[in-house]
């Protein structure tokens, strides 16, 4: 996703819980993508979450659901009024968990938190600064918390992600989460 956004010309700052995970991207200055999208996308890496969030309009959180609370806790001191945080994907009630964690940490900023029903890309990391995009979904539901702000959330990201469509509320994106159905089946 970072490589694709960089390739499209969007300013991208990348932060990871393990800074070593970004060494290859930092060295290359971005991410090379191949597959249904081909090219090199410029990506800035940040070792500091404060630097990554500073001045960002939209924060895309792409981590396993088990990390939503931890990432929210780490973001809480640095988020500012007007920023949007979108969990990709939210999985089951991710936006609710993220919002509660921000409040627990004392974040008083007017931050709009939302979630996508699933990840937009079928992709895999193929190298330290490379990814293969096998496909991009045509439509993904997304919702904000509170639901009345979903239009505001989507207006800000439509230029980058025209595939996002409004869901009625985060319970729709959470309870229609295909990962909760698909992944346990594979294990069984």
Spans of model-derived segments:
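Rossmann-like NAD(P)(H) cofactor-binding subdomain of soluble oxidoreductases
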Residues: 65-127
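Internal alpha-helical scaffold of NAD(P)-dependent oxidoreductase catalytic cores
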Residues: 127-188
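Rossmann-like NAD(P)-binding element
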Residues: 36-86
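A general structural motif
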Residues: 9, 56, 81-82, 110, ...
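NAD(P)+-binding Rossmann beta1-loop-alpha1 motif at the extreme N-terminus of oxidoreductases
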Residues: 1-34
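Short, charged/polar "capping" segments at the starts of alpha-helices
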Residues: 20-25, 93-96, 150-152
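Short mixed-charge
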Residues: 29-42, 110
